[in-house]
């Protein structure tokens, strides 16, 4: 978290609710699925795709209408298709909140129209958006400026896609009770920032300023080139290179450097497989933020049958044999 203000205040979040709706539909439905528009769509208020009960529309088209046009009718159609009813779908939304560890978010419907007890916090809405943005199809939809479906062209309500060069998503929201809500995401120089404001009448300007500040004052440290060497006993090589399984990344303020620490054994025994996990690499920012990745063997080291075993190797083998014997004995009991 780079900046926060009243991040845990529970508030209505209007159509940004549809971030969760789209995420669940993408998990449960195929894009090519055909949805028969249910009669419930005729009674939905607010922004609309203009769907007609009884017509058939693919899930993919409904998702674009949901996230670009903010169609409340699309939200209902998708909810009924995915779960059988709006109520059942809302229950799935709340189950997903629990799975994400969210304790101050509750949904009563899939579109975000005002409902008693429905809402979230800026912090938890950011968690939902971050989770949704992990889905490639979701990212593609929310980054789309306009989409023509059935002869109608829908323009994304997210103005930042046109006004902020690095914007890549995600969703606007508004009701009289909730005010203006905006969840935005922008990417620059390998760094992706997510911004959430609730009940902010100056959201476009505030998001532009916050994103500019975030990119100017922070950088993404990438731990490329980190490498360790461990002694190897009983191998055809006397040492093996150990590298991060994936390049570790940590967001830092400009001018900061991370603490780099590795949890590794003092030596290892052959045989070793390429990619075998040998330890953990941890990057720690000055504020205590951490990220960890596995450290793995960069190349395989086969066992050398011609080498005599050293005392530590004999001891290690005896220990392993004793462990297997103990396991076998316990298993027989």
Regions found by a protein language model. Name each.
Residues 1-123, 127-136:
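Active-site-adjacent loops and short helices of periplasmic peptidoglycan-processing enzymes
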Residues 102-106, 114-333:
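Domain-terminus/edge residues, biased toward the C-terminal soluble/receptor-binding domains
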């Amino acid at each position: 978290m780079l900046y926060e203000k009243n991040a845990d205040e529970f508030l209505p979040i209007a159509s940004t609710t549809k971030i969760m709706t789209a995420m669940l539909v993408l998990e449960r439905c195929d894009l090519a699925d055909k949805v028969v528009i249910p009669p419930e769509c005729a009674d939905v208020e607010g922004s609309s795709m203009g769907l007609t009960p009884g017509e058939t529309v693919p899930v993919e088209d409904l998702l674009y209408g949901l996230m670009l046009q903010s169609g409340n009718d699309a939200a209902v159609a998708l909810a009924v298709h995915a779960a059988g009813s709006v109520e059942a779908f809302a229950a799935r939304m709340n189950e997903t909140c629990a799975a994400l560890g969210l304790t101050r978010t509750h949904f009563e419907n899939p579109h975000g129209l005002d409902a008693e007890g429905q809402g979230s916090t800026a912090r938890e809405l950011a968690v939902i958006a971050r989770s949704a943005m992990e889905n490639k199809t979701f990212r593609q939809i929310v980054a789309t400026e306009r989409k023509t479906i059935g002869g109608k062209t829908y323009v994304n309500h997210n103005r930042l896609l046109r006004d902020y060069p690095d914007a890549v998503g995600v969703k606007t929201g508004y009701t009289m009770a909730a005010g203006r809500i905006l969840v935005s995401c922008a990417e620059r120089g390998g760094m992706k920032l997510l911004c959430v404001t609730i009940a902010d009448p100056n959201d476009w300007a505030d998001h532009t300023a916050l994103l500019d500040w975030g990119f100017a004052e922070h950088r993404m440290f990438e731990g490329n080139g980190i490498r360790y060497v461990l002694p190897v006993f009983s191998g055809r090589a006397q040492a093996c290179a150990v590298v991060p399984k994936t390049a570790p990344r940590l967001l830092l303020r400009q001018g900061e450097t991370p603490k780099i620490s590795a949890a590794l054994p003092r030596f290892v025994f052959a045989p070793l497989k390429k990619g075998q996990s040998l330890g953990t690499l941890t990057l720690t920012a000055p504020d205590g933020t951490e990220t960890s990745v596995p450290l793995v063997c960069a190349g395989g080291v086969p066992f050398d049958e011609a080498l005599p075993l050293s005392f530590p190797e004999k001891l290690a083998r005896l220990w392993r044999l004793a462990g297997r014997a103990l396991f076998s004995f316990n298993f027989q009991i």
